[in-house]
Amino acid sequence: MKIGFIGTGNMGTILIESFIESKAADPSNMTITNRTIEKALHIKNRYNSINVTESLEKLVSENEMIFICVKPLDIYPLLARALPYLRKDHILISITSPVQTEQLEQYVPCQVARVIPSITNRALAGVSLVTFGTSCGESAKAKINELMQHISHPLQIESDITRVASDIVSCGPAFMSYLIQRFIDAAVSETSVSKQDAILMCKEMLVGMGKLLETELYTLPALQEKVCVKGGVTGEGIKALESGVQDMFHRVFQNTHMKYEEDISAVKKQFHV
């Protein structure tokens, strides 16, 4: 199957690299383009057989599955340019959360899906969030799932939980990274540990914790209970976390949903739906 990618920004590049390195797709069967073509050529420097084009017509016409990896408000004008070349048998996949499959289906003649990836997919791990349009046939669904299974655990979701699911899967690594950095900074500030050692210890702790959860020996609450011995130092640390966290994550979700609604409103004005 030939796959085209429109947009080689952060997530577009992650998908391209992950598909190649997982052997989900051969680079010779992939065509990429970008508004700044030098970014696409930079990828070709690493994967020589990948195809690069500046022609949207060529990319759309010569590929069966097309990933749109551009910003939400860039999708509508992009589709206006691609529309003459889209066929009924094309599989069009958007990776951005504010654009709904129903909006795409009203505008294009082909099969439509939304796949929201995560930076964790770069390690061929984590979840990808999949929403199929009503136009998406069983064969297309199978192709999308098979492709995403090479780099992730594809989880089919309905539109009403898109934002919270994206917050956990896609934004989550950034949220956790921020918290770990503050954890490291506090350790360095409060004790004599070096930043280099604190980073190493935290990194290995996170890797080990991930592997431990993967074994399913412990749930998160069970893991906490195993470490948090009654009367021990961990319990004192948990007390500090409880007083500090409070409604913090509630506010995180409130903020992301507020921005999401703004993005949805802007997209609706473009699609008139």
Swiss-Prot record:
GO terms for molecular function: pyrroline-5-carboxylate reductase activity. GO terms for biological process: L-proline biosynthetic process. Dispensable for transformability. Not known if it can act as a pyrroline-5-carboxylate reductase. This is ComE operon protein 4. It comes from the Bacteria. Signal peptide: none annotated. InterPro entries: 6-PGluconate_DH-like_C_sf (IPR008927), NAD(P)-bd_dom_sf (IPR036291), P5C_Rdtase_cat_N (IPR028939), P5CR-like_CS (IPR053790), P5CR_dimer (IPR029036), Pyrroline-COOH_reductase (IPR000304). Belongs to the pyrroline-5-carboxylate reductase family. Pfam families: F420_oxidored (PF03807), P5CR_dimer (PF14748).
